[in-house]
Amino acid sequence: MMTQFWITTPLEKMTPEQWESLCDGCGKCCLNKIIDDETDELYYTNAACHLLDNDTCGCRRYPNRFTYVPECTSITPENIAELTWLPDSCAYRRLHVGKGLPSWHPLLTGNKEAMHAAGISVQGKTVNEMKVKYLEDCIVLWPMLDVE
């Protein structure tokens, strides 16, 4: 069984491999979001980055994603506090605020199937952003409703 490094290792001390393994691969960070100009309220949409594979919830061009999507955000220990748009289910966010990993997390289950089965991921729930005319028509609540 894998050592539960996330319990004993501070985020800023993790190796790049440990840091990357924290990502559950849910795909929610790849959803387009809208921030209301007047209220600063955050809204998730089901319009996903055109590089997201809707079946695997992975980026089709992950190693080179910034070439294709320059505005893609790299989540790091240095910027995690600023990324308030990450969903509460995100392992990076959870660990940053002192919570543990949820029971469905791939580091605890050994695969992504429990996450998909629990409805945590975006699997089968997104549309390609290139096919969307108005993001406002794509606002959804489910990315925020599935926290353990």
From Swiss-Prot:
It comes from the Bacteria. InterPro entries: Puta_zinc/iron-chelating_dom (IPR005358), UCP006173 (IPR008228). Signal peptide: none annotated. Belongs to the UPF0260 family. This is UPF0260 protein Sfri_1740. It comes from Shewanella frigidimarina (strain NCIMB 400).
